[in-house]
Amino acid sequence: MLSAKKSLTLALVVPHVLLYAQTRALAFIEPKSNKKRYTSLPNYSLQTWNMDCHTLLKGSVVLRYKLTSMKEDNEVLLLKGNEAIARAAIRCGCDGYFGYPITPQSEVLETLAELKPWETTGMVVLQAESEVASINMLYGGGGTGKRVMTSSSSPGVALMQEGISYMAGAEIPGLIVNVQRGGPGLGTIQPSQSDYNQATRGGGNGDYNVIVLAPASVQEMADFVDLAFTLAFKYRNPAMILSDGVIGQMMEKVVLPPFKPRRTEEEIAEECPWAANGHGLKKRGPQVITSLELEPTKMEIKNLHLQEKYRQIKENEVRYETQQLDDAEYVIVAFGSAARISQKAMETARKQGLKVGLFRPITLWPFPEQQLREIAQRVKGFLVVEINAGQMIFDVKLAVEGKVPVEHYGRLGGIVPNPDEIIEALKKLQK
């Protein structure tokens, strides 16, 4: 377990590691001189210097760069979900990635290593020695106000839970990507959705929540990276993209957004006055970033503050998608890849005369309970489809409040349900 002293040390040391790695791929300009000093790097080309270039500060040295390999327009590519995550991270102004390879998400790290963003945007990419190390690097980098992220799969994310709890308690923003596989234990490398409870209930110790986004396409894998960072920094809270092996490995057309410039140290100091940036740019006095508070009264106040923040997130950030609900008598509730399969089941069932609709939660936390509660007043029942033994069904039941039946259909062991199985489950619900 990290002590408060070690946690603070990480928060202070990691930004210098980030800046050191950034400077390897940059040219230098001293603020009091017009002379330019260029680093010598292979396969690296600098464009004309201008005032539109991204600006970094390291002590009294101003670093500006603009690179020829950065495409400013949208780009359309055929990508795996994992590859889309990596490319979107580079384009959304991510400062650093710290991860460890594990099937079925290893392509995230592999793609970043292949693209070498440290030579284009200055983004740091580091393979940590373990998942435990990577989440604590996230703590340190996020504590400096940087946009930092990690990715893993179910057993690896389980190892990160202590660090995620620390980040939530210290109110440090950051992005965790979980490309789920089957469990428990080492389980299988096949897809699953069995980490729902862990993600939505706060898998570590204490009363906390993580903002959870569930993509159902490769396009959403890309789109949710920037969205997750935006929400994480808006609320000073960890955010998670909860995907699975199906979405991570499937290939689809993706429209990647234009490059968003990484923020300067001055911009970070302005936007994140709480950050330990180490540059003397803070807008207020010394700030200790920690989840530790030994005085019970102060700890209660801190927890009440967190709960108020979570209330605001619930009020403002619920996201969901609906299909064919206008005349629906029964509603399938599913997220991620299970929602894609359920959509096909819904379309086939309607051809057979069944009035079925689809409700897809996009934010698993905050969960769209009020929306489901309203739908329950006009339908006859819900079928919750998951690739697990039944986890989201409890949130659906809480939302419906017993007004109509709520049943579950799922497959285990890395096996995904097929549309015909879902239709049979719908017919049983009708009886």
Predicted features, each with a name:
Residues 210-267, 381, 421-431:
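Structural signature of the thiamine diphosphate
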Residues 80-84, 307-330, 343:
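Glycine-/acidic-rich phosphate or pyrophosphate-binding loops and their flanking alpha/beta elements
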Residues 236-322:
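Conformationally flexible catalytic loops at phosphate/diphosphate-handling active centers
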Residues 386-431:
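Peripheral docking tails and interdomain loops at the edges
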